[in-house]
């Protein structure tokens, strides 16, 4: 590689990194503390912290004073907006209600001072939590896993291969939605659920999307649908979370793929590893909101009967599973 080539690559890296910085700085919660979606993310984050505390083996009585006080205040501010998500408020109220009834010790002064505000929120939103916040029993099923269950899961996971030969049969909208519901159960930082997905059925719109991605030549246009997975930067509140959208989006995408696979639908993940100018082309084509970032595309459809897939052998497990020399060390020197 010549010096000029290195310089050009470095320039592209700097330009794209600056673009990422500007987008995260401008649209995350760092500078948009009163944005409705940022407030919603703050509520999700804090009431999940309350939930986590309630699941500990022996929660400290009236733990998390600062978090609880902040959560009640944020819920009040959010509830005064013209538009808000009642489910989020209902779940937060449910978590706070369980918190308030979880301890034998007498309530402290600070809790008594916010009880009136919580009572008002409970009166307005307690009926809105279709999926209650707080905690629940893990359930017997989690303790009844067997070697057979583990083997079935291993067989399922290992059966997945990227499909690049799709039949003409279209995937039903109800099935696509069911796979999204499954993917919604993916882990996300403090349950903030930043991932979004759009489906594009086979046709002009899907083809325009695929033309912007360089890994689908020869098969992309035959897919029943193309999924575009994105992440909402307004769900992230600190500089330390600047990469979290891609972590959560990757987990969501994998579970979306597995949800489709479980229903007989093949997939091929299409990376969106591009520089800022190419990303801008997609944004213009879709009029993508500036607070969303692209995670990946997924070509999907029913495999052709005679479809072939790659072997894609995996590297040795001992290159992936890193074991400490003495089994109990922090350093792998």
Task: Mark where each language-model region is.
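Acidic, surface-exposed loops and disordered segments
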Residues: 1-333
